[in-house]
């Protein structure tokens, strides 16, 4: 069991994990992965066991002009449906906490769709709190 930076060879596994989260399939995933992997303010991580990717997480660091520390945002986080409740999500979350502390972030944020009740319970157990209000303006 290991956590490592994703490579482009992980694209198909990540596409399958995104599909489990109800994201539509897209031919752009590999290209977007390359963009993320070349961004110094982002990490694309995978959890691998016996040569199989069974979880992934995208972490983005956001610089803050008004505060000393940056903040970290979990943009995507998925564990294979067949591998849930085995500590994989916890291992990935603990790994990003270490990255955020190393970067001197003052918080980690995560946006999680309201229909993902099991994910909410996971985040609450890890110490996350609901902090309203999150406003979104579609632009495309």
Each PLM stretch: what is its role?
Residues 124-133:
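Conserved acetyl-CoA-binding loop of GNAT-fold acetyltransferases
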Residues 100-111:
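Conserved GNAT acetyl-CoA-binding A-motif
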Residues 109-119, 136-138:
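Conserved beta-strand-loop-alpha-helix junction that forms the acyl-donor binding cleft
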Residues 8-69, 75, 93:
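Acetyl-CoA-dependent GNAT
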Residues 76, 85-98, 121, 125:
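Conserved acetyl-CoA-binding loop-helix of GNAT-fold acetyltransferases
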Residues 69-81, 133:
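Conserved acetyl-CoA binding element of GNAT-fold acetyltransferases
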């Amino acid at each position: 069991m290991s956590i490592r930076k994703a490579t482009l060879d992980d694209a198909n596994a990540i596409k399958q994990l995104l599909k489990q989260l109800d994201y539509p399939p897209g031919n752009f995933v590999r290209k977007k992965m390359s963009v993320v992997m070349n961004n110094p303010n982002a990490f694309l991580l995978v959890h691998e066991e016996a040569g199989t990717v069974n979880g992934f997480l995208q972490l983005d660091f956001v610089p803050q002009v008004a505060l000393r520390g940056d903040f970290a945002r979990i943009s995507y986080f998925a564990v294979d449906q067949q591998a849930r409740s085995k500590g994989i999500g916890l291992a990935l979350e603990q790994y990003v906490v270490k990255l955020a502390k190393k970067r001197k972030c003052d918080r980690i944020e995560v946006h999680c769709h309201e229909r993902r009740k099991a994910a909410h319970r996971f985040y609450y157990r890890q110490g996350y709190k609901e902090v309203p209000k999150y406003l979104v303006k579609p632009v495309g």
